[in-house]
């Protein structure tokens, strides 16, 4: 029997590094999204990315990741060093509050472990960080998932181990001649990988993101809703699938069942098949519309699940023995009559469910609490139109009151903002006026302050003393007839004289 194939890059020694790796869910989402987008776009290159986190001694946390640009050189790929350095600096700047740094890289790895194609890239990352780990995604486990299996990934550490050439032989024959080696020669070393155990940690922000993914975001819109619509058949619970097909008769289309479409498929000509194109009707929808469709789909699924649960409860109650039903109930009397009729006719008695008091109490509590979760307008069947209108009016008043409260809060916020702006304007006005007053006081203290203005009626621009102005006026009045001049110019001339 042939020996099992052993990966030569996997170390046979146990790990003595005692590394403890904590994996966060956000890198897993980013890596899976990158793989999905690459597959849908038909990407033919290498799927390689970097892992950033914290490394405290022997403890490593993997918190974020980003894709890495690679170049194809012959048979292998290599990392664009300049691009990687620039992108790593950007990621460090974004997460500088957490002091995140490069701790490893990820790629697609077979279940048996890394291959020779991974060594050039790992050697580059090993030069950046000797403790860099390799997160290998197993694509085959992603394509063929099995319930209960762990995450389709493995984390490896790398070490330089001495290779003496005997590891290539997996079976050692007793008594076989072996080559003598020079013990003084320096032994060769090669990179070997070892599997590392890891734990998962989740932060508060990551829990919010996972909750959004679990509930179904805008990217979770079902693809079957674009061309296929499901309608419930009245006679059975199986949905009838209908598909919009082109009948090649003008521009009209009609909805036919899947069986009819399969029957009509052979009659379609090859030319029509070549020219027919399936257009996605959701291609031009906005994000808000996609979110609305996703919310409607989630509500539809919830209603369907509730309907199935109610059908199960009704079926359970219908299969209870007649003695567990009230004697005054019409349905119980009808069941007793049917049972007596079957006994007289010799027919087989129906199989009743084993009653459970716990289940019956839960059903009773559910029926009792129905009135608490339903509105008054839908709780009773005998309400008149006036009462329903009253309930609707009360609801509209409540909505109007809440709307007014919200708008009032907004107006108060705007008013407070305006008051704050007015206070700032008042402070600036006070500073300007204070500066002007101080300047005027300085000019007055220097005896006029301004230069001589020939167009001003008094020298000094009105900044001089009152006695000088009175003297100038007296001189002007006493010599008005002798000077032959009048007005401000004459006054100035007489004052100069």
UniProtKB/Swiss-Prot annotation:
It is found in: Cytoplasm; Nucleus. Keywords: Cytoplasm, Nucleus, Signalosome. Residues 258-272, 333-343 have a biased composition (Low complexity). It comes from the Eukaryota. The keyword Transit peptide does not apply. GO terms for molecular function: metallopeptidase activity. One of its GO terms (cellular component) is COP9 signalosome. Gene3D superfamilies: Cytidine Deaminase, domain 2. Residues 21-162 form the MPN domain. Residues 475-488 have a biased composition (Gly residues). CDD domains: MPN_CSN6 (cd08063). Residues 230-282, 324-350, 435-497 are annotated as: Disordered. Its main location: cytoplasm. Pfam families: JAB (PF01398). Component of the COP9 signalosome (CSN) complex. Component of the COP9 signalosome (CSN) complex that acts as an regulator of the ubiquitin (Ubl) conjugation pathway by mediating the deneddylation of the cullin subunit of SCF-type E3 ubiquitin-protein ligase complexes. The CSN complex is involved in the regulation of the circadian clock through its control of the stability of the SCF(FWD1) complex. Belongs to the peptidase M67A family. CSN6 subfamily. This is COP9 signalosome complex subunit 6. The gene is csn-6.
């Amino acid at each position: 029997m042939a020996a099992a194939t052993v990966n030569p890059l996997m170390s046979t020694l146990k790990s003595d590094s005692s590394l403890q790796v904590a994996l966060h869910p956000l890198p897993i989402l980013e890596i899976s999204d990158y793989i999905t987008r690459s597959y849908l776009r038909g990407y033919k290159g290498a799927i390689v990315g970097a892992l950033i986190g914290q490394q405290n001694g022997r403890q490593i946390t993997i918190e974020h990741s980003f894709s890495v640009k690679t170049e194809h050189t012959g048979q292998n790929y290599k990392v664009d060093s300049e691009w990687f350095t620039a992108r790593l600096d950007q990621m460090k700047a974004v997460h500088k509050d957490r002091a995140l740094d490069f701790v490893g890289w990820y790629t697609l790895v077979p279940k048996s472990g890394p291959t020779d194609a991974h060594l050039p890239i790992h050697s580059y990352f090993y030069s950046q960080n000797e403790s860099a780990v390799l997160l290998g995604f197993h694509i085959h486990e992603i394509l063929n998932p099995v319930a209960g299996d762990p995450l389709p990934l493995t984390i490896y550490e790398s070490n330089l181990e001495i290779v003496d050439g005997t590891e290539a032989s997996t079976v050692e024959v007793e008594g076989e001649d072996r080559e003598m080696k020079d013990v003084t020669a320096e032994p060769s070393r090669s990179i070997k990988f070892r599997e590392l155990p890891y734990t998962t940690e989740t932060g508060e922000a990551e829990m919010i993101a996972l909750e959004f993914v679990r509930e179904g975001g805008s990217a979770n819109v079902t693809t079957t809703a674009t061309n296929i619509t499901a309608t419930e058949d009245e006679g059975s619970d199986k949905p009838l699938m209908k598909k919009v097909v082109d009948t090649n008769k003008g521009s009209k289309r009609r909805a036919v069942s899947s069986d009819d479409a399969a029957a009509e498929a052979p009659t379609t000509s090859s030319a029509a098949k070549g020219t027919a194109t399936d257009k996605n009707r959701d291609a031009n929808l906005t994000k808000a519309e996609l979110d609305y469709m996703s919310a409607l789909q989630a509500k539809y699924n919830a209603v369907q699940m509730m309907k199935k649960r109610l059908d199960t409860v009704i079926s359970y109650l219908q299969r209870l023995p007649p003695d567990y039903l009230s004697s005054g109930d019409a349905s119980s009397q009808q069941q007793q009559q049917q049972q007596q009729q079957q006994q007289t006719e010799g027919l087989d008695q129906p199989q009743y469910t084993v009653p459970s008091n716990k289940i019956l109490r839960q059903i009773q509590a559910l029926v009792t609490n129905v009135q608490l979760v339903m509105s008054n307008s839908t709780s009773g069947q005998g309400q008149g139109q006036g009462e329903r209108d009253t309930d609707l009016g009360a609801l509209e008043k409540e909505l109007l009151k809440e709307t007014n409260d919200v708008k009032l809060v907004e107006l108060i916020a705007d008013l407070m903002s305006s008051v704050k702006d007015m206070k700032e304007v008042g402070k600036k006005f006070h500073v300007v006026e204070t500066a002007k007053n101080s300047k005027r006081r300085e000019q007055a203290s220097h005896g006029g302050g301004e230069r001589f203005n020939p167009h001003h009626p008094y020298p000094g621009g009105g900044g001089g003393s009152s006695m000088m102005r009175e003297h100038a006026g007296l001189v002007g009045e006493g010599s008005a007839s002798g000077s032959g001049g009048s007005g401000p110019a004459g006054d100035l001339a007489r004052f100069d004289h």
